[in-house]
Amino acid sequence: MSFTFLNQLPTPDEIKRDYPLSPELKELKKQRDAMISNVITGKDSRFLVIIGPCSADNEDSVCDYVSRLTKIQEDVKDQLIIIPRVYTNKPRTTGEGYKGIASQPDPEKAPDMVEGLIAMRKMHIRAIEESGLTCADEMLYPENWGYVEDLLSYVAIGARSVEDQQHRLTVSGFDVASGMKNPTSGDFSVMLNSVYAAQHPHHFVYRGSEVQTTGNPLTHVVLRGAVSKHGNTTQNYHYEDLIRLHDMYAKMDVVNPAAIIDTNHSNSGKKFKEQIRIAREVMHNRQLSSDIRGLVKGLMIESYIEEGNQSIGNHIYGKSITDPCLGWEDSKRLIYDIAELNAK
């Protein structure tokens, strides 16, 4: 019933000094951030595809996967902006299990937060260097932002974190597109209140300092489905869900109303192959309604080199050790399909 203080963590400035981003890649990130911002604000009609492994567990296979997206991005550049998922923190429903490379650089060894912060930054830098694509990550721990704020072009706040005040206030200081997921209950009001909070300025304590933020106008919602009080999954990507969200957004004092649809989690019931059908349904609904087309700015898809998932210790290259993912061939075909549907 007490804390044992194990190690003093390096500061963000120390980690960034030891693992810097080159001037060329800083410029690349600036350009990518601007493109993504223009999609969220409605200045660019391209569509966002945030795609990658459930959790970024292995630097080699994750960077291999991300590099494969480079050619596809070139092929679909007129229709899509691909944002690789490099999720270095894994929220756990019960608190048990693999919590991501930022906590546990080697899934088969004990946690090591110091090495984890280094592994997190190194993986993101390598992914950008090898692919030319800046990535997305989930900000499970708000205090980690400083270690990657110069690397990420998209941030997600998860279903279990979205009601937390510190997460909301911290996002108000981010300068990149940030998606607030609906809570596991599915309550749209909670999700929209988190967007309102993050879009407005705040005065609070962050990493031992008193800080002030200006608000993040690029904060938006992510629909990931829900779990009922009886433990059943319910979906929230259907036509009527999106119209309801559009109408609720209209009553909020927020700017840039936008939504990303998470095709996995409770929307698919974790039946990973359903992501293909769900993605196509969302794109079809965008064709049916100008309101939905204006609202839905992208899809979030869980995908890796090998489909499905595996137990830790099986060592199948490019296969998820957490939630099951689409395999590469299905993912590639789906991205091209999304590009074609966005053009209609």
Task: Specify the residue positions occupied by each region the protein language model found.
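N- or domain-start disorder-to-order transition segments that initiate the globular core
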Residues: 1-41
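N-terminal beta-rich core of secreted/periplasmic extracellular enzymes
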Residues: 25-38, 72-83, 89, 120
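Acidic (Asp/Glu)-rich catalytic clusters
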Residues: 40-43, 70-77, 125-130, 213, ...
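Conserved phosphate/anionic-ligand binding catalytic regions in large, soluble enzymes, centered on
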Residues: 48-61, 323
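Conserved, mostly hydrophobic/aromatic
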Residues: 52, 261, 327
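Short acidic, Gly/Ser-rich segments with clustered Asp/Glu that frequently serve as metal-coordination loops
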Residues: 54-57, 256, 264-270
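Active-site-facing alpha/beta catalytic cores
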Residues: 66, 79-244, 265-266, 270, ...
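Internal helix-turn-beta structural module
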Residues: 304-342
